[in-house]
Design a protein with these regions (language model features):
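ABC-type nucleotide-binding domain
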Residues: 4-280
Length: 280
């Protein structure tokens, strides 16, 4: 972890040096110190409200570190997506602290913070351009070889190779000619080429058939390797291999543990599991 004294820095920036992410801490004498970015994320008694009269999150505490997969489950409106929005600093919290590698995220430039976070959404954002260009959007200076390698790791290379012009096939608009699964594979490849230390997977496999989900899940597994990963999903297969599962209800974490521990408790998670995860 970065020494706690770093929180007093007025400016903390993330940068990439020779393929490694690092924090750059400026000092009063004009020098800087580089500290490798790890991806430790801590929520410390966090409260949050979109409006003053309605609190959304209550006393949220959690810790996630590289190599860990932390999943959030619960009914719609429980606060799952709100937590990931706070990691991105789309909103500032009302009380408590969020730390990233020991640094209060309020001390980190928003652009730098978000550059170190990869996101895979259910509604994949593709644009008019080639497949290569869409994947490269995750890292604009990526070489063709890096893009292709990312697609291979994401399990997208096979379907891309079957397209009329492969990686040079042009997608129109939102790439409606591709299946939902193919669109998600491109989104995974884009996140893979970005090679960020923290990954957020939001509803990433909830609208595809079971067969396609297996292909996407394989790409997801490669993407999550060695990273700090936060997952929000509808399907139990997406979360049951998580290191920690946070069961949320009305903005609170009411249960936490791994799949086996929560099943043994026979609480809310057990109800969701036996009910085919319909509420998650």
């Amino acid at each position: 972890l970065v020494n706690a004294s770093c929180e007093n820095d007025k400016l903390v920036e993330s940068e990439v040096r020779t393929g490694l992410w690092a924090w750059k801490h400026p000092h009063h004498d004009g020098t800087t110190t580089l500290t490798q970015l790890k991806g430790d994320v801590v929520f410390d008694h966090v409260d949050f409200s979109y409006t003053p009269d309605k609190q959304i999150l209550h006393d949220i505490s959690l810790y996630a570190k590289p190599g860990q997969k932390v999943a959030f489950v619960g009914a719609t409106g429980a606060g799952k997506t709100t937590i990931t929005n706070l990691i991105n600093r789309f909103y500032d919290i009302a009380d408590g602290k969020i730390r990233y590698d020991g640094i209060n995220i309020n001390k980190i430039k928003k652009a730098d913070l978000r550059r170190s976070l990869g996101i895979v959404l259910q509604d994949t954002n593709l644009f008019t351009g080639t497949v290569m260009e869409n994947i490269r959007y995750g890292k604009l200076d990526a070489t063709d070889e890096e893009v292709i390698e990312a697609a291979k790791r994401a399990n997208a290379h096979y379907f891309i190779s079957l397209l009329p012009e492969g990686y040079h096939t042009k997608l129109e608009g939102d790439a409606s000619g591709l299946s939902q699964g193919q669109r998600q594979l491109l989104s995974i490849a884009r996140a893979e080429v970005a090679d960020t230390p923290v990954m957020i997977l939001d509803e990433a496999t909830s609208s595809i058939d079971t067969r396609t989900e297996a292909i996407v899940s394989k790409g997801m597994d490669a993407l999550m390797e060695g990273r700090t990963v936060f997952v929000i999903a509808h399907r139990i297969s997406t979360v049951q291999n998580s290191n920690a599962i946070m069961v949320m209800d009305q903005g609170r974490i009411i249960e936490r543990g791994d799949h086996d521990e929560l099943i043994a408790e026979k609480g809310k998670y057990h109800q969701l599991y036996t009910g085919a995860f319909e509420e998650a």
